[in-house]
Amino acid sequence: MNRSEKPQLRATTVLGVIRNGKAALGSDGQMTLGNTVIKHSTKKIRRIQHANLITGFAGATADAVTLLDRFDEKLQAFGGQLERSAVELARDWRTDKYLRRLEAMLAVVSADKALIISGTGDVIEPEDGIVAIGSGSMYALSAARALIRYTDLSAREIVTESLKIAADICIYTNDHIVVEEV
C-alpha cells in the first residue's frame, strides 16, 4: 500500500432469515483494516425493543451507529412502521449533506419482514425473506438459500450454519458468531 492510499476497513457478514413466523439475524465479529485483523468480536447486531426488530450493519462502525440511531428515531416518529421508517431513513440518508457521506448498510428483520437499507436510497425487501450484507454476504446468502430449500432447520440454525460456512470461505469473516431472534 502506498502512502496516498487509505487502508480499507473491511468487516462483517450479516445475515437475516425469516422462517415459520420467526426471524433471526446474526453476524460474525471480525474487523479488518487493510490486511490485518484488528478485532475478533465486534458487535454488529442491535435489538430495537420497542419495535420488536433486530438490526445489523456493515461498514464503518461510527457511521452505522449514527444510522441505527436515526432509524430508531424514525421508528418512534412513525409508530413502529418498519417500511415507512426505512423509506424515510433512506430518503434522509440520500439527501442530507451530512448523512450521505456515511458509509454503511443496514439489515433489518422482524418476524414477518426483512429489509436492506442502503445509502443510495434503496430499501430492498428480498422475496425469499433472507437479507445479507457485508464482505461475506454472498457466501452466507447462498448457504442460507440451500439450507432453507433442503432442510427443516429453524431461522436461528440457518443463520448460524450459514455464517459458519461464510467464515470458512471469506477471509473477512470469522466464526465469532452472534445471533438474535424475534
Swiss-Prot record:
<protein>
    <recommendedName>
        <fullName>ATP-dependent protease subunit HslV</fullName>
        <ecNumber>3.4.25.2</ecNumber>
    </recommendedName>
</protein>
<feature type="binding site">
    <location>
        <position position="170"/>
    </location>
    <ligand>
        <name>Na(+)</name>
    </ligand>
</feature>
<dbReference type="InterPro" id="IPR023333">
    <property type="entry name" value="Proteasome_suB-type"/>
</dbReference>
<dbReference type="GO" id="GO:0009376">
    <property type="term" value="C:HslUV protease complex"/>
</dbReference>
<feature type="active site">
    <location>
        <position position="12"/>
    </location>
</feature>
<keyword id="KW-0915">Sodium</keyword>
<dbReference type="InterPro" id="IPR001353">
    <property type="entry name" value="Proteasome_sua/b"/>
</dbReference>
<keyword id="KW-0378">Hydrolase</keyword>
<dbReference type="InterPro" id="IPR029055">
    <property type="entry name" value="Ntn_hydrolases_N"/>
</dbReference>
<comment type="similarity">
    <text>Belongs to the peptidase T1B family. HslV subfamily.</text>
</comment>
<keyword id="KW-0963">Cytoplasm</keyword>
<keyword id="KW-0479">Metal-binding</keyword>
<dbReference type="GO" id="GO:0005839">
    <property type="term" value="C:proteasome core complex"/>
</dbReference>
<keyword id="KW-0021">Allosteric enzyme</keyword>
<dbReference type="GO" id="GO:0004298">
    <property type="term" value="F:threonine-type endopeptidase activity"/>
</dbReference>
<keyword id="KW-0645">Protease</keyword>
<dbReference type="GO" id="GO:0051603">
    <property type="term" value="P:proteolysis involved in protein catabolic process"/>
</dbReference>
<keyword id="KW-0888">Threonine protease</keyword>
<comment type="function">
    <text>Protease subunit of a proteasome-like degradation complex believed to be a general protein degrading machinery.</text>
</comment>
<dbReference type="GO" id="GO:0046872">
    <property type="term" value="F:metal ion binding"/>
</dbReference>
<feature type="binding site">
    <location>
        <position position="167"/>
    </location>
    <ligand>
        <name>Na(+)</name>
    </ligand>
</feature>
<dbReference type="InterPro" id="IPR022281">
    <property type="entry name" value="ATP-dep_Prtase_HsIV_su"/>
</dbReference>
<comment type="subunit">
    <text>A double ring-shaped homohexamer of HslV is capped on each side by a ring-shaped HslU homohexamer. The assembly of the HslU/HslV complex is dependent on binding of ATP.</text>
</comment>
<dbReference type="Pfam" id="PF00227">
    <property type="entry name" value="Proteasome"/>
</dbReference>
<feature type="binding site">
    <location>
        <position position="173"/>
    </location>
    <ligand>
        <name>Na(+)</name>
    </ligand>
</feature>
